[in-house]
């Protein structure tokens, strides 16, 4: 009767175990970064739907103001036609403009309903159960210059840049693991043996040290190492390229923000000028020194 139990423990595997554990940790960090990136994308989409609703509601409010103005103009022109001061052509021009405004109002109202439905669907609510209560008071927030940070300094706060760095870390670890697969491995072992021959029992302990040299893998292994080294270089080059693209993207976004702020400044100034122009054109029309086309043009600019 012969029996026994043996066990072995790897002492050196070319770093495969160590680098494998590090690779697992890096993959966990990648998962967290992707999760954060997804959250940011969801927030951005919700904000886009939100401000789309706000914009359309402001358009409706503007069109309502225009409709009230046209209603007053129509009333005045109708009275002028009845008094024989002007002809019906002016009245028809006002009526056509009223129809155009009503058509625009219907289109914007439909677009608002669609945008509200999209917002509700995205956040998991029925469209008729949500509304956006934001009123634009015509004032500007603080200048965006107060929030400016250079794109280079902002890279560290972006998930995209961190993901690029993790991809480089993964390629380095995989390269080291590939090298480790072609290095000798050392393992220690021990066991307990028992034999009973010719009615003589003979139990004993054994110990061993095993060194394995992957001779048959040297050729294919060297090819794998070269291939993995190229992947490391590719990941580093990709990170450098994507870094520049991220900087350009952030700079373009900043330019869009500053341009939009300047456009709003110009628009606020233009509102006052257009309001005064409309008032003057009304006076000129009533005095008979301008045409209905001039008055309607001033009204459309307002």
Annotate each PLM feature.
Residues 140-193:
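Acidic, glycine-rich loop-and-beta core segments that form the ion-binding/anion-interacting portion
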Residues 17, 87, 157, 221-224, ...:
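Short, conserved glycine- and acidic-residue-centered signature motifs
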Residues 38, 42-61, 79, 115, ...:
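Amphipathic alpha-helical coiled-coil segments
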Residues 41-155, 253-256, 260, 302:
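Periplasmic alpha-helical coiled-coil/stalk elements that build and connect Gram-negative outer-membrane
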């Amino acid at each position: 009767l012969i029996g026994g139990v043996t066990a072995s423990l790897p002492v050196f595997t070319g770093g495969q175990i160590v680098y494998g554990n590090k690779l697992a940790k890096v993959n966990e960090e990648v998962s967290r970064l992707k999760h954060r990136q997804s959250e940011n994308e969801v927030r951005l989409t919700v904000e886009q739907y939100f401000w789309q609703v706000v914009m359309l509601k402001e358009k409706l409010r503007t069109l309502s103001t225009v409709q009230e103005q046209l209603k007053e103009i129509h009333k005045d022109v109708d009275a002028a036609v009845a008094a024989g001061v002007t002809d019906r052509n002016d009245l028809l021009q006002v009526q056509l403009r009223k129809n155009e405004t009503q058509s625009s109002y219907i289109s914007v109202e439909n677009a608002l309903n669609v945008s509200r439905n999209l917002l509700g669907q995205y956040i998991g609510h029925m469209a008729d159960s949500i509304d956006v209560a934001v009123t634009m008071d015509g004032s500007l927030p603080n200048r965006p210059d107060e929030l400016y940070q250079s794109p280079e300094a902002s890279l560290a706060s972006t998930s995209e840049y961190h993901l690029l760095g993790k991809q480089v870390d993964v390629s380095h670890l995989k390269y080291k693991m590939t090298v480790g697969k072609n290095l000798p491995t050392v393992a220690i072992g021990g066991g307990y043996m028992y034999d009973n021959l010719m009615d003589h029992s003979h139990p004993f302990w054994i110990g061993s040290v095993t060194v394995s040299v992957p001779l048959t893998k040297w050729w294919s292994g060297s090819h794998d190492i070269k291939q993995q080294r190229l992947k490391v270089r590719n990941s580093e080059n990709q990170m450098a390229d994507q870094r520049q693209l991220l900087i350009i993207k952030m700079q373009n976004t900043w330019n869009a923000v500053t341009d939009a702020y300047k456009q709003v400044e110009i628009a606020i100034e233009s509102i006052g000028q257009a309001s005064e122009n409309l008032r003057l054109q009304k006076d000129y029309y009533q005095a008979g020194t301008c045409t209905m086309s001039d008055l309607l043009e001033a009204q459309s600019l307002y």
